[in-house]
Amino acid sequence: MMSKLICVARIGAAHGVRGEVRLWTFTEDPLAVLHYGPLTTKDGSRSFEVTKAREAKDHLVASFKGITDRNAAERLNGVELYVPRDRLPETDDDEYYHADLIGLAAETTAGAPLGRVLAIHNFGAGDIIEIAPPSGSTLMLPFTNAVVPTVDLAGGRVIIELPDEIDGEDRASADESASAEDDAAAPNSARHPRESGDP
């Protein structure tokens, strides 16, 4: 069975004239991309080997094998780079790869279905879990032990304790989402999510 692919980096604009590029990594240690072996596009049609990288503000400046001039580097702008999930290190307790969370069923502590995990975000004030209900607006909740007390990867679900701040229309929307999914079909039954980990 093929291992799930994890996006570990995205290539940005060219840097200089010798084929270097700006590289945004999604790893806990930005330089970990040097240790994962060949990186590929999502469809596997292209492979890239990072030959060197250095830190620069909020990104890396990196070189790839075979990319030696600015024109070649410019053509890579926007390319996302992936590695197989089994090539990454195991996570610690209460740490999760984003890709392992996306798609999990979300339920309330009372067992009512809410929808599925759509994404994990961080806008600078902590991690946010986005839940997509069967209909209506998505729910954006803090990804903390208090709000998400249980992550059951084996069972394919997360348990959500809806915070008191979700009231009025938002709380009603969440309750309606749970009710709507009940009527359809029940799904199969401080956190630190990360897109990838240290080598």
Swiss-Prot record:
Keywords: Chaperone, Cytoplasm, Ribosome biogenesis, rRNA processing. Signal peptide: none annotated. One of its GO terms (molecular function) is ribosome binding. Residues 93-169 form the PRC barrel domain. One of its GO terms (biological process) is rRNA processing. One of its GO terms (cellular component) is cytoplasm. Pfam families: PRC_RimM, RimM. Binds ribosomal protein uS19. The PRC barrel domain binds ribosomal protein uS19. An accessory protein needed during the final step in the assembly of 30S ribosomal subunit, possibly for assembly of the head region. Essential for efficient processing of 16S rRNA. May be needed both before and after RbfA during the maturation of 16S rRNA. It has affinity for free ribosomal 30S subunits but not for 70S ribosomes. Belongs to the RimM family. NCBIfam families: 16S_RimM. This is Ribosome maturation factor RimM. It comes from Bradyrhizobium sp. (strain ORS 278). The lineage of its organism: Bacteria, Pseudomonadati, Pseudomonadota, Alphaproteobacteria, Hyphomicrobiales.
